[in-house]
Amino acid sequence: MIEVRELVKNYGSKRVLDHISFDVNKGEILGLLGANGAGKTTTMNIMTGNLSSTGGTVRLNGHEILEEPLQAKKELGYLPENPPLYPDMTVKEYLKFAYRLKKCRLPYKEHIEDVCKAAYITDVYDRVIKNLSKGYRQRIGIAQALIGEPKILILDEPTSGLDPVQMLEIRNLITRLGKKHTVIFSS
């Protein structure tokens, strides 16, 4: 499902990733753990095609991210470290925006209902995002990552800034998502 081979990233003369290789199979959950500056976000940005590597390859469901970026990204749902939410939108408006941006072809109403159920946000569907807790905002970010039924989810720091109860909720959500998706998260 995910193949990372000999991944290298240099920023000038500083090497931040040094020949990293790993596989994540269908239905597995992989956590990238490490101190700030360890290269977790850099690895995820390369895996999502948002940053080029100095060397090595990334394949998502058989598609090399640099050679076949459109096909690879169709397999992918991504939650960046700072979810790109629009605080003045309602959850409904934001998810509709994300659905259109991703050019999703699944039946809109049913698909968005499924995404909201999966991310446990149905109870805030009509609320304005800026009025919601950080935990809900993270779940909204996860919901947008689920749009289009991607096989692979990459979640960068999904529990960052959350209180212990919210952290547990997000970790439980990731565990449930791992039953249908291959998941990589950083912490």
Locate each region found by the language model:
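Catalytic Walker B motif of ABC-type/P-loop ATPase nucleotide-binding domains
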Residues: L153-E157
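Conserved ABC transporter NBD signature motif
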Residues: G56-E67, Q71-A72
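A short, proline-enriched helix->beta-strand linker immediately N-terminal to the Walker B motif
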Residues: I147-K151, K180
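Hydrophobic anchor residue at the start of the ABC signature
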Residues: I142
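Helical segment within the ABC ATPase nucleotide-binding domain
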Residues: M167-K179
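Conserved ABC ATPase "signature" region
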Residues: K96, R100-K103, P107-V124
